[in-house]
């Protein structure tokens, strides 16, 4: 008889958290056993959690051996401590929260290896975003002049998006060292956007948007634009489902959905 896999959802009150709760509720062999939120009321059914699910307001309340998986859609301020806690308690994290530094991610990878606990941090769970990054990395071999525009909803806490930063890192790995317009002068501070190893990143925050990204390449007499659009948060759930099904095959923390596909 197959054992039911137990899932804790951190940030279950948010839009992505609710999508994750709905996903797990409809997955065979998985069950939401708990939620973590500092502001939730102790009424799990109000948040579409099973009636038996426990709601915790902080990490210190969570008992040992509660869950097998930890889905995290919280905030940039909370995510590092959340994932650290999960790894220390041998709960496999599936993390969609962005905003951690490279140093924090590196520390968590070291911890996961020490504890021999697999997990995933994904800047984006959408398949279109994963493919955009893959295609952009390939194009960078031939078009070193490139800029990134990412557009998200007005409530997004971090900028640039984790997807845009991950895209820039992948491009930088595959691109000759290059600085576009090295002699430019800004007459309005930061008008040219953020800079990652010579790659300009522009962040747009507006109502009505969900998650969108364009990578613009320019060359002599030609241009290439790669774009992806997420029109509904439900589009990310296929990636979360894949992660839940695969992370128990890992013995360390992995960055990027593309690395488990």
UniProtKB/Swiss-Prot annotation:
PROSITE patterns: DAPB. Its EC number is 1.17.1.8. Pathway: Amino-acid biosynthesis; L-lysine biosynthesis via DAP pathway; (S)-tetrahydrodipicolinate from L-aspartate: step 4/4. It catalyses: (S)-2,3,4,5-tetrahydrodipicolinate + NAD(+) + H2O = (2S,4S)-4-hydroxy-2,3,4,5-tetrahydrodipicolinate + NADH + H(+); (S)-2,3,4,5-tetrahydrodipicolinate + NADP(+) + H2O = (2S,4S)-4-hydroxy-2,3,4,5-tetrahydrodipicolinate + NADPH + H(+). The active site is at residues 152, 156. InterPro entries: DapB_C (IPR022663), DapB_N (IPR000846), DapB_N_CS (IPR022664), DHDPR_bac (IPR023940), NAD(P)-bd_dom_sf (IPR036291). NAD(+) binds at residues 11-16, 96-98, 122-125. It is an enzyme of class 1 (oxidoreductase). The keyword Oxidoreductase applies. Keywords: Amino-acid biosynthesis, Cytoplasm, Diaminopimelate biosynthesis, Lysine biosynthesis, NAD, NADP, Oxidoreductase. GO terms for cellular component: cytosol. GO terms for molecular function: 4-hydroxy-tetrahydrodipicolinate reductase; NAD binding; NADP binding; oxidoreductase activity, acting on CH or CH2 groups, NAD or NADP as acceptor. Belongs to the DapB family. Catalyzes the conversion of 4-hydroxy-tetrahydrodipicolinate (HTPA) to tetrahydrodipicolinate. HAMAP family: DapB. This is 4-hydroxy-tetrahydrodipicolinate reductase. It comes from Lactobacillus helveticus (strain DPC 4571). The gene is dapB.
């Amino acid at each position: 008889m197959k054992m039911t896999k137990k899932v804790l959802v951190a940030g279950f009150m948010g839009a992505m958290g609710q999508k994750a709760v709905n996903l797990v509720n409809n997955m065979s062999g998985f069950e939401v056993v708990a939620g973590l939120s500092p502001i939730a009321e102790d009424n799990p059914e109000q948040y579409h959690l099973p009636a038996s699910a426990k709601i915790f307001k902080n990490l210190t309340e969570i008992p040992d051996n509660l869950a097998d998986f930890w889905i995290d859609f919280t905030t940039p301020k909370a995510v590092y401590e959340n994932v650290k806690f999960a790894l220390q308690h041998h709960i496999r994290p599936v993390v969609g929260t962005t905003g951690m530094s490279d140093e924090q991610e590196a520390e968590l990878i070291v911890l996961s290896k020490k504890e021999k606990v697999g997990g995933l941090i994904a800047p984006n769970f959408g398949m279109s975003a994963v493919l955009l990054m893959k295609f952009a990395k390939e194009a960078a071999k031939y078009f070193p002049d490139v800029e990134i525009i990412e557009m998200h909803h007005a409530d997004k806490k971090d900028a640039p998006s984790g997807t845009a930063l991950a895209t820039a890192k992948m491009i930088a790995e595959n691109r000759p060292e290059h600085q576009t317009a090295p002699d430019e002068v800004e007459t309005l501070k930061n008008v040219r956007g953020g800079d990652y190893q010579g790659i300009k990143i522009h962040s747009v925050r507006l109502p009505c948007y969900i998650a969108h990204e364009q990578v613009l390449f320019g060359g002599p007499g030609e241009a290439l634009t790669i774009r992806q659009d997420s029109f509904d948060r439900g589009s990310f759930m296929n990636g979360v489902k894949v992660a839940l099904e695969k992370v128990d095959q890992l013995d360390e923390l992995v960055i990027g959905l593309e690395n488990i596909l």
